[in-house]
């Protein structure tokens, strides 16, 4: 349904709804005295062209009295292709205190130029790249990409990790964060809270 929502403009309202929902949940955890961890929220390329998008998201997070460091914004690499307007928007989001994550890196678009021009805090390696692990040339490619991003001062998150072989290889690359079914499938809030309690014990 995402392509349909992007065509009819409803994706803007959906993005805002999800952003508000995450802010509301973070605020609830804060009231409960839990240690807050950053939560990433996707923002579509259509929303990025919405007028006053930065001010809108700033206003929402202020309404919940939250620090913007607890909400990270993920944009897909397809939204960054040779676009000065997006470049300026990312700088505005950074000025507002948001961290910007480049999602789906390596999923089919040319992102190397974007790494050079745009200030991303983190790149998220797409599962299609992680699946190269076990292939000599694929592993060399992953090694080169991570070293390049790290040389720009960016953190690395690997997506779609499903095997211990993938986990060990990515740990050896000094990936900052690793996510995937190897650890857990997406969880409802209550189950996530239980897992978090167990991890902290």
Language model features by range: what are they?
Residues 58, 87-91, 142-146:
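Short amphipathic alpha-helical segments and helix-helix/interface helices
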Residues 57-67, 90, 116-119, 171:
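Acidic (Asp/Glu)-rich catalytic clusters
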Residues 1:
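Conserved, function-defining core regions and hallmark residues within catalytic/recognition domains
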Residues 44-51, 70-83, 96-201:
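EAL-family c-di-GMP phosphodiesterase catalytic domain
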